[in-house]
Amino acid sequence: MKQKVSVPFMLLGILFNVCLIAANLLETKVIQIGSLTVTAGLLVFPISYIINDCIAEVWGFKKARLIIWSGFAMNFFVVALGLIAVAIPAAPFWEGEEHFDFVFGMAPRIVAASLMAFLVGSFLNAYVMSKMKVASRGRHFSARAILSTLVGETADSLIFFPVAFGGIIAWRELLIMMCIQIILKSMYEVIILPVTIRVVKAIKKIDGSDVYDTCLLYTSPS
């Protein structure tokens, strides 16, 4: 029996992957927001958590898990291609090699930290969203979205910064950076929440899906 792919699900999945890849590339630039110094990935990475919330809310944990693994695979693929391109000698007349290498030749330690943090944070976000939906019988979406994002973003930052920069940046500075990232990413979720609510309602109406993960074995691959 053929499985029909939902158009809204497919579009959100594509956007999820685009946001993750863009965030990894933007992470190479450090930007200033007022007195705060953050990476440019902050501009787009929180959107992946918002999409994760939408997918877990509408289609359940299994579909969220599928999208998370696809995001991991696409990120790994892009990183691998980037490292291969960096390793291939550039044309003698090309002057942009140094800048290209800076963007795509990310240190293996940072790449590993990013992929590890993404997996743990995203799965925690989807898990909390799924469990709270069942416990609340589908009510209080706003609270569930904010709390699940806070849990996921906290786990992401607690893994990424120590693994990527431990021993390079002072631990006090790392702690400050982690707190800033967690707070700003969570604020991002709160600010865009009215849009998220409308999108979820529209998708449920169009797609006719509203999955509750009752009695779901979360560790099962199927």
Where do the protein language model's features map onto the residues?
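Membrane-interface interhelical connector segments
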Residues: A85-M106
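Membrane-embedded alpha-helical bundles of multi-pass transporters/translocases
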Residues: M74, E97, R109-G121, M132-S136, ...
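Internal alpha-helical transmembrane segments of multi-pass membrane proteins
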Residues: A135-T154
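Alpha-helical transmembrane segments and their lipid-water interface positions
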Residues: E27, V78-V86, G121, N125, ...
